[in-house]
């Protein structure tokens, strides 16, 4: 039975390879990035104190931006505002890669001024998710 099961599993793996139907996911659609962003909400933003300032990073969201239409960020209860996303680089092997010309995935604020951050994302299928976190990235008031 073990040999039959092993042979069956090997055939399931080999068939797409032999027919050329196995392709790597590019993570360029909402369907592909939603599951990832759903389980990585704690990483959506990061606040870092550096050089006498708070730096608010959205690097994680930029890394999955090809499945997004928009991100909005609100600081300390302010209405969320649109943060531009760099383009999806469909001509590259890693379309979500952050290239030198894409700009910085952060903004500067006065030191210790960020207490809470509201993050809203809109996927390319027009669905959305939101999250409010404290400066440590821990969810609050959702």
Would you name each region that the model predicts?
Residues 81-94:
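Solvent-exposed serine/threonine-rich low-complexity stretches and specific carbohydrate-binding patches
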Residues 106-115:
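Surface-exposed, short loops/turns at beta-strand junctions within beta-sandwich domains
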């Amino acid at each position: 039975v073990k040999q039959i099961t092993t042979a069956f599993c090997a055939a399931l793996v080999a068939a797409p390879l032999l027919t050329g139907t196995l392709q790597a996911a590019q993570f360029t659609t909402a369907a592909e990035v939603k599951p990832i962003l759903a389980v990585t909400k704690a990483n959506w933003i990061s606040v870092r104190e550096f050089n006498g300032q708070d730096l608010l990073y959205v690097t994680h969201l930029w890394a999955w931006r090809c499945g997004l239409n928009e991100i909005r960020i609100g600081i300390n209860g302010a209405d969320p505002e649109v943060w531009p996303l760099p383009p999806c680089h469909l001509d590259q092997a890693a379309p979500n890669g952050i290239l030198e010309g894409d700009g910085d995935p952060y903004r500067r604020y006065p030191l210790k001024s960020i207490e809470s951050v509201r993050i809203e994302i809109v996927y390319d299928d027009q669905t959305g998710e939101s999250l409010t976190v404290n400066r440590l990235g821990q969810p609050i008031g959702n």
